[in-house]
């Protein structure tokens, strides 16, 4: 992990929040990727480490990026140049990608049943689990005859056992105690 991650994180968070608010996450990621590549250019790296005034540096950087940056992307470059932070653009991109992945996370949910479930049943399970987990859900369905009837749902460390086998096991535990 780069030493600049702590510096890059607030810029990435601000860019990501703005991108989500304006429904332009893909566009922002593309702009950041292009700008990060520009900073890796040897001549640009030399300019970034030099003693150019922030205004001059941001103007040069924006001129090099051209049409790749929209007005908001240019504003980010200006702010980062004023704070002498353009060299952390690759880390801003990396943090932006992490934020995007986290926001688009899909929960893997395992559904175990004795028989094949209908599309309607699967849709109801997806709807209920998305509501409960507050994120998109991808079902991995398995058939296990030992379940007997009902279903077992596993999502991370959460287990919902609505199977006949589970009920029988709980009943046996109660009778033995």
From Swiss-Prot:
- Kindly provide the name given to this protein in its UniProt entry: ATP synthase subunit delta
Q: Which organism is it from?
A: Klebsiella pneumoniae subsp. pneumoniae (strain ATCC 700721 / MGH 78578)
Its subunit composition reads:
F-type ATPases have 2 components, F(1) - the catalytic core - and F(0) - the membrane proton channel. F(1) has five subunits: alpha(3), beta(3), gamma(1), delta(1), epsilon(1). F(0) has three main subunits: a(1), b(2) and c(10-14). The alpha and beta chains form an alternating ring which encloses part of the gamma chain. F(1) is attached to F(0) by a central stalk formed by the gamma and epsilon chains, while a peripheral stalk is formed by the delta and b chains.
Q: Which GO terms describe its cellular component?
A: plasma membrane; proton-transporting ATP synthase complex
The record's listing under InterPro entries reads: ATP_synth_OSCP/delta_N_sf (IPR026015), ATPase_OSCP/d_CS (IPR020781), ATPase_OSCP/dsu (IPR000711)
Q: Which taxonomic lineage is given here? A: Bacteria, Pseudomonadati, Pseudomonadota, Gammaproteobacteria, Enterobacterales
Where does the record say this protein resides? Answer: Cell inner membrane
Mind listing the GO molecular function terms for this protein? Answer: proton-transporting ATP synthase activity, rotational mechanism
Q: Which family does it belong to?
A: Belongs to the ATPase delta chain family.
Source superkingdom: Bacteria
Q: Does the keyword Transcription apply?
A: no
Q: What does this protein do?
A: F(1)F(0) ATP synthase produces ATP from ADP in the presence of a proton or sodium gradient. F-type ATPases consist of two structural domains, F(1) containing the extramembraneous catalytic core and F(0) containing the membrane proton channel, linked together by a central stalk and a peripheral stalk. During catalysis, ATP synthesis in the catalytic domain of F(1) is coupled via a rotary mechanism of the central stalk subunits to proton translocation.
């Amino acid at each position: 992990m780069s030493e600049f991650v702590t510096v890059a994180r607030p810029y990435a968070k601000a860019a990501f929040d703005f991108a989500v608010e304006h429904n332009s996450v893909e566009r922002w990621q593309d702009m950041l990727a292009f700008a990060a590549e520009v900073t890796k250019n040897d001549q640009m790296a030399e300019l970034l480490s030099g003693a150019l005034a922030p205004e001059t540096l941001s103007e040069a950087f924006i001129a090099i990026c051209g049409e790749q940056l929209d007005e908001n992307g240019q504003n980010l470059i200006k702010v980062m140049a004023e704070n002498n932070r353009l060299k952390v653009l690759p880390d801003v991109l990396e943090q932006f990608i992490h934020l995007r992945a986290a926001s688009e996370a899909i929960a893997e949910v395992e559904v175990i049943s004795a028989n094949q479930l209908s599309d309607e049943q699967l849709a109801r399970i997806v709807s209920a689990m998305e509501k409960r987990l507050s994120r998109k859900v991808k079902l991995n369905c398995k058939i296990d005859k030992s379940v007997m009837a009902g279903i077992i749902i596993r999502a991370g460390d959460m287990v919902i056992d609505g199977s006949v086998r589970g009920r029988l096991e709980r009943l046996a535990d109660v009778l033995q105690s």
